[in-house]
Swiss-Prot record:
Phylogenetic classification of the source organism: Eukaryota, Viridiplantae, Streptophyta, Embryophyta, Tracheophyta
Name of the protein this chain belongs to: Subtilisin-like protease SBT4.9
GO cellular component, one term: extracellular region
Active-site residues, record numbering mapped to chain: 145 (charge relay system), 200 (charge relay system), 499 (charge relay system)
Keywords linked to the UniProt accession: Autocatalytic cleavage, Glycoprotein, Hydrolase, Protease, Secreted, Serine protease, Signal, Zymogen
Gene for this chain: SBT4.9
Length: 713
């Protein structure tokens, strides 16, 4: 998701907040609207099964109509089974009761969440970074987003050979759109063509896998080389999002095609305002079937922070990414006539050349504004003012259509005091500049927080990555301020949001896959989580704990050699869903095979790289256990010893049994149990610790979080 100026919803890896907008088609008798009918996996034997014919027959049976072509919107038939159709409420109810149907849910509208960042992560350009270019060139990342700008230099195929032989996709992108050996595939589900109008999809794709392009900047600000984490990788663009958002049926269509086309990873920077259960969340559905085919899905956490429980990506088979800043930030200085200087946040490309203008702190209406710098509590974009100084301070720089700077409350009050106490107050707003941010990384305020409200014992988000003030390729069809009054057009622009952090982690996942092409999605996810930089709970609120950053900040270099990994297969996820009380009939359809939910599998015992448990508030003392199994991907004859590090303020007692793991061979698996006990947990904060398995070379770290807090508290 990215953040835009003014009403710009945070764009997060597509995550401007998920606004629900159901489109209805009026019939003479009842209103019809688009519903998605999810039917699980495709039959294992498809010789006599034609998905579309089955879907049409269901519609004929339910509607009583012989011709239902006008009812069918999409048929999902390549990677999983289902369809989207226009139904009345009573027809929806009848479909939901039919054998072979897992769920029926409305087609809601998802929206997008929107150079130095890779250097900050340690994945530097040049010979000092280890790369496997042959496999990197065979790695394909699919982006489900707003399309792509194919002419961008970031997607040039100079030096690229033909697409990998495994590629089964097409370039079905519309008129005047050409794919190449870098951008090897494009599909459109919006009827607009795959060309990116918003700029969001172009930005995310270039962040993960764009070519290295020298001397890029935003009007001279932040000059450097723009590049992706895996610039030799191939890109496939799936346009599921238009200016109006991203429909459920389009998102599922994109997953259906991307999986069958042969992508290796999926990056999706989209999200919703309301969390959805797994069987009604199109991203969770698509990502599950991708996981079964060996494809990891990376999704933005959302831009609903710092509110607790705002994380919308909550499935354990998805790698969920929060957003943090880097050591490069953009600031805009305000210089007053009395010589005082204040440092604010914005991305101001306008140069007033130090000229002073009258400051005006009155009404925002009328001719008194003309030719002045307006000092107001909120951002304005009036065309008659020279510039704007406001109190709308955020921890990210926004692009405006006129010179502006957002100050902290104290600094803004100082400016107001100067305006009110001076006969002829004047000042100026300088052009933005890049500064070194020594305090980085810090989770952005807009980044969505846990706890997970669907599976309370699964910690989300998983990790954090750069998502603040990211410079990357952009669509010249949109303005950098994303405002129709802004007549500027740029090839590279700066966006903030979890939409920007998501492709960073997609790039990291692709980087790992170039060294370990045989690794499963869960192994890659585990490597990223257990090697992440530890972050500290810097505040006294839930929003400043592991619910903000998960396992920590991604470290690409460490992640290619994690030592141990936590593996999770399809059967483990099915057992997890059994533990959440999904019935065996629905799970059989989802899994495409017989399922028996025997006993009660505790969701917290899913072999996840982090450990989390929500405790009953009624219990003053507690004991919880976590069962885990690790696989050795390091060296043979290695011995790992466990170490527990309690976080500040935690009074937990943590025991690990066995406390030593002796791995004789690579791929060997060993199990252990973590027992956590304590009493009187703070009802407003989690208590946490870290389990570290170390063999002297590798440090395999897992956060342990116990809490009683509820979002409704």
């Amino acid at each position: 998701m990215a953040r835009r100026a003014d009403s710009f919803c945070l764009i997060s890896c597509v995550l401007v907040s998920f606004v629900i907008s159901v489109s209805a088609v009026t019939d003479d008798s009842q209103d019809k609207q688009v519903y998605v009918v999810y039917m699980g996996s495709l039959p294992s034997s498809r010789l006599e099964y034609t998905p579309m014919s089955h879907h049409m027959s269901i519609l004929q049976e339910v509607t009583g109509e012989s011709s239902v072509e006008g009812r069918l919107v999409r048929s999902y038939k390549r990677s999983f089974n289902g369809f989207a159709a226009r139904l009345t409420e009573s027809e929806r109810e009848r479909v939901a009761e039919m054998e072979g149907v897992v769920s029926v849910f409305p087609d809601i509208n998802y929206k997008l969440q929107t150079t130095a960042s890779w250097d900050f992560l340690g994945l530097k350009e040049g010979k000092n970074t280890k790369r496997n270019l042959a496999i990197e060139s065979d790695t394909i990342i699919g982006f489900i987003d707003s399309g792509i700008w194919p002419e961008s230099e970031s997607f040039s195929d100079k030096g690229f050979g033909p697409p990998p032989k495994k590629w089964k996709g097409v370039c079905s992108a519309g008129k005047n759109f050409t794919c190449n050996n870098k951008l090897i595939g494009a599909r459109d589900y919006t009827n607009e063509g795959t060309r990116d109008i918003e700029g969001h999809g172009t930005h995310t794709a270039s962040t993960a896998a764009g070519n290295a392009v020298k001397n890029t900047s935003f009007y001279g600000i932040g000059n450097g080389t723009a590049r992706g984490g895996v610039p030799a990788s191939r890109i496939a663009a799936y346009k599921a999002c238009s200016e109006m958002g991203c429909t459920t049926e389009s998102v599922l269509s994109a997953f259906d095609d991307a999986i069958a086309d042969g992508v290796d990873l999926i990056s999706i920077s989209l999200g919703a305002n309301l969390v959805r259960t797994y069987e009604t969340d199109p991203i969770a559905i698509g990502a599950f079937h991708a996981m079964v085919k060996g494809i990891l899905t990376v999704q933005s956490a959302g831009n609903g922070g710092p509110n607790p429980g705002s994380v919308m990506s909550v499935a354990p088979w998805i790698l969920t990414v929060a957003a943090s800043n880097t050591n490069r930030g953009f600031v805009t200085k305000v210089v007053l006539g009395n010589g005082k200087t204040f440092v604010g946040k914005s991305l101001n490309a306008f140069d007033l050349k130090g000229k002073n203008y009258p400051l005006y702190g009155g009404s925002t209406d009328g001719p008194l504004l003309r030719g002045k710098i307006l000092v107001s509590e909120d951002k304005v974009s009036s065309e008659i003012v020279v510039a704007n100084i406001n109190e709308n301070y955020h921890d990210y720089a926004y692009v405006s259509i006129l010179p502006s700077s957002a100050l902290s409350k104290d600094d803004f009050d100082s400016v107001i005091s100067y305006v009110n106490s001076t006969k002829s107050p004047h000042g100026t707003v300088l052009k933005s500049e890049a500064i070194f941010n020594q305090a980085a990384p810090k989770v952005a305020g807009f980044s969505s927080r846990g706890p997970n409200t669907i599976a309370v014992d699964i910690l989300k988000p998983d990790v954090t990555a750069p998502g603040v003030e990211i410079l990357a390729a952009f669509s010249p069809l949109n303005s950098p301020a994303q405002d129709k009054r802004d007549n500027r057009h740029v090839k590279y622009s700066v966006l903030s949001g979890t939409s920007m952090s998501c492709p960073h982690v997609a790039g990291v996942a692709a980087y790992i896959k170039t060294f370990h092409p045989e690794w499963s999605p869960s192994m890659i996810q585990s490597a990223i989580m257990t090697t992440a930089w530890p972050m500290n709970a810097t505040g006294t609120a839930v929003a400043s704990t592991e619910f903000a950053y998960g396992a920590g900040h991604v470290d690409p270099i460490a992640a290619i050699n994690p030592g141990l990994v936590y593996e999770i297969g399809k059967s483990d996820h099915i057992a997890f869903l059994c533990g959440l009380n999904y019935n065996a009939t629905s799970l059989k359809l989802i899994a495409g095979e017989a399922v028996t939910c025997t006993g009660k599998t505790l969701p917290r015992n899913l072999n996840y790289p982090s450990m989390s448990a929500k405790l009953p508030k009624s219990e003053s003392s507690f004991i919880v256990t976590f069962n885990r199994t690790v696989t050795n991907v390091g060296t043979p004859n290695s011995t790992y010893k466990s170490k527990i590090v309690l976080n500040h303020g935690s009074n937990l007692k943590v025991e690990v049994s066995p406390s030593v793991l002796s791995m004789k061979s690579v791929k060997e698996k060993q199990s252990f149990t973590v027992t956590v006990s304590g009493s009187n947990i703070d009802p407003k904060l989690p208590s946490s610790a870290n389990l570290i398995w170390s063999d002297g070379t590798h440090n395999v770290r897992s956060p342990i979080v116990v809490y009683t807090y509820s979002v409704s508290d």
